[in-house]
Structure formats: structure tokens, C-alpha cells
């Protein structure tokens, strides 16, 4: 068969499954199954790139954060690398579609991960946290050990909530040499204040599930 067509159709299918999760909370019984299908199809499609997209895991506090790495080219020559971080409702697979192609076309390695609160991690009890620089540091720890990453040209790009997480991480980690943000949520308080749950009474909050309490 035609590998490019196969790759494109697998990635298209992955994104269709991903779109079905847009308005679904992680405590929905279908969330885990569909999320796993997103990952399965994406990895099958990613394997058909040249070089193939690599799935990797970042050790973090006794568990791991899932991510993807697309090399700029074959071989282990160190080159500039872009790490992308998403926001409140993103999957690492989303972020690949967002800018990986553009990064690759400009000679960058591209990496992205799910931080606590993102992707399927809420199903493991890993919800958002205020010290997001801690998991980002763990990601950088993994990246700088790769022979194909130029440690003097590691940059990070964040969208939405990631537009807050990225500069925060750079404040704590000088290994991040440059940052860029898009539609950054730099103050979450006004955003959360517009959400119905923020207006719940103590009696209503007593009926929250453990998932909602964590979020």
C-alpha cells in the first residue's frame, strides 16, 4: 500500500476520535476507551513518518508523563529543539498537529508531552497543579540527555494555559533558552470565576466526585 496515504488516514482517524472527547469530562466511562484509541491510531500513523515519531515517557514522582518526539532528521547530530506545552483541555496528540510540521520544516526537533491534568492523566489522579514548572523540568531532564538535542538551543512554546506554564518553567529552568506563547491564560482566576462550578454552594460541592474535587 501507499505509506503516505496510510499515515494520513491513521492520523485523520486519531483526530476524529480526539474530537469526540472535546465536550466529554474524564469521568465519563467512554473517555478512557476513546482516549486510548486516539493514542493507538496516532502512534501507528506516527511510525510512518521518516524519521518516525517516537513515543517516550518522562519519569515523574513515581509515575510517567507520555510524550512524542519528532527528530529534525536522521542521525544524532544535535540540533535546535522545540518543546510544546498545551493548556486545560489538550492532549499531546493535539499539539503535534498544531505545530510539529512547521517546526520540522524549519529544522527543529519537536517534542510535546501531557503534563498532570492533561490528556489521559486525570484518569490516574494526576490533576493540574500550581507548580507546573516541576513536571516541565522533568521533561527537560529527559530531552537534554538525548544526543540529537542541542542543549544550547532548547526553546518552549505554550498555548492557552501552556502560555502560563512555559514562562513559569523558564523562570525556574535556565536550560530553556527561549519561550513563545499564544493566547496565553496568564491569570486563571477570572476564567474560573465564569464557570458554573465556581458558583456552587457548599451543599452542592458536597456532591462532587473525587475527580471534580481534584480539578
Q: Which residue ranges define each predicted feature?
A:
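N-terminal targeting or regulatory segments adjacent to alpha/beta-hydrolase or S9 domains
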Residues: 1-50
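N-terminal cap/lid segment of alpha/beta-hydrolase-fold proteins
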Residues: 32-76
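Short beta-strand element of the alpha/beta-hydrolase
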Residues: 77-87
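The serine-hydrolase catalytic nucleophile loop
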Residues: 88-101
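Conserved alpha/beta-hydrolase
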Residues: 103-120
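Alpha/beta-hydrolase active-site loop
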Residues: 126-152, 156, 168
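Gly/Ala-rich beta-loop-alpha elbow adjacent to hydrolase catalytic centers
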Residues: 158-162, 166
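Hydrolase active-site cap/lid region
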Residues: 171-215
Amino acid at each position: 500500500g501507499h505509506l503516505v496515504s496510510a499515515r494520513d488516514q491513521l492520523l485523520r482517524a486519531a483526530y476524529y476520535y480526539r474530537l469526540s472527547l472535546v465536550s466529554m469530562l474524564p469521568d465519563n466511562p467512554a473517555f478512557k476507551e476513546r482516549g486510548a484509541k486516539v493514542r493507538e491510531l496516532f502512534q501507528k500513523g506516527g511510525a510512518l513518518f521518516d524519521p518516525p515519531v517516537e513515543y517516550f515517557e518522562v519519569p515523574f514522582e513515581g509515575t510517567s508523563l507520555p510524550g512524542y518526539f519528532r527528530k529534525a532528521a536522521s542521525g544524532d547530530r544535535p540540533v535546535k529543539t522545540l518543546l510544546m506545552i498545551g493548556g486545560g483541555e489538550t492532549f499531546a496528540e493535539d499539539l503535534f498537529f498544531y505545530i510539529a510540521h512547521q517546526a520540522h520544516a524549519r529544522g527543529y526537533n519537536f517534542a510535546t508531552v501531557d503534563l498532570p491534568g492533561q490528556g489521559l492523566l486525570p484518569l490516574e489522579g494526576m490533576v493540574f497543579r500550581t507548580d507546573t514548572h516541576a513536571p516541565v523540568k522533568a521533561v527537560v531532564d529527559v530531552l537534554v540527555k538525548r544526543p540529537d538535542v542541542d542543549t544550547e538551543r532548547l526553546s518552549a512554546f505554550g498555548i492557552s494555559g501552556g502560555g502560563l506554564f512555559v514562562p513559569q518553567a523558564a523562570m525556574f529552568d535556565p536550560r530553556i533558552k527561549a519561550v513563545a506563547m499564544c493566547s496565553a491564560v496568564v491569570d486563571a482566576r477570572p476564567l474560573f470565576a465564569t464557570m458554573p462550578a465556581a458558583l456552587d454552594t457548599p451543599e452542592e460541592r458536597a456532591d462532587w466526585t473525587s475527580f471534580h474535587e481534584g480539578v
